[in-house]
Amino acid sequence: MRIGLIDVDGHNYPNLALMKLSAWHKKQGDIVKWYEPLFDGFPAPPLDRVYMSKVFTFTPDYEFPVNGKEVIKGGTGYFYPEGGEPLPEEIEHIFPDYGLYGIKNTAYGFLTRGCPRGCGFCIVGHKEGRKSRKVANLKEFWNGEKEIVLMDPNILACRKHTELLGQLIESRAYVNFNQGIDARLLTPENVTLLNAIKIKKYILRGTIRETKKRLFQS
């Protein structure tokens, strides 16, 4: 099969779903490429399948006609707030194709999904559920990369967070908690675990200045 991919939001930030779709189709022996309207559009022969992924609702939709026998749209940008159909399990848990975006030393992924908070500005509770749960081990999307971008909405709320933080510690990679850390769950035990991680970037959610100081106490 000839597979086309469209990152509707642009290529400024790697789309994890597209990287997984690329990895799975390449494993099947399919030809995977970025859809290019100049070369793949009409009157060129249609691609067998084109995936269009849109994360943000404010992103304008793709402006060009899509020349594909089958066109599949996905992402919260198209299906707000439910998020649309999830990826099949065999695709969801495949190692991402980081080469799609030319990524060499950074891993992207989720160890947990869901969040109990239900904040009015956030769709995670509606989309992923009001309970944080483990969905993967680190090895599922990390293979020695120097940096890990962790996209978990609330890893500390997961019952297995101690195990998962231990995996991050053992990796010795720099970790970017890009969705933040819930300051309300900063127990002394959790602070000790976080102090053992090589944290590159973090945001404290639901906090005050005094709570922020606790994160890196010796």
Predicted features, each with a name:
Residues 1, 73-112, 122-147:
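N-terminal [4Fe-4S]-dependent radical SAM core
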Residues 25-32, 67-79, 85-90, 169-176, ...:
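Structural alpha-beta junctions
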Residues 5, 34-36, 71-75, 108-110, ...:
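A structural signal for short, well-ordered beta-strand segments and their strand-loop junctions
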Residues 18-22, 61-67, 83-87, 163-168, ...:
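Short, aromatic/basic amphipathic alpha-helical patches
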Residues 1-2, 29, 45-47, 68, ...:
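A general structural motif
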Residues 1-73, 79-80:
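A short, structured N-terminal alpha-helical element that caps or precedes a catalytic domain
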Residues 5-6, 10, 51-55, 124-218:
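Core AdoMet radical
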Residues 116, 120:
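Cys/His/Pro-rich metal-binding microdomains
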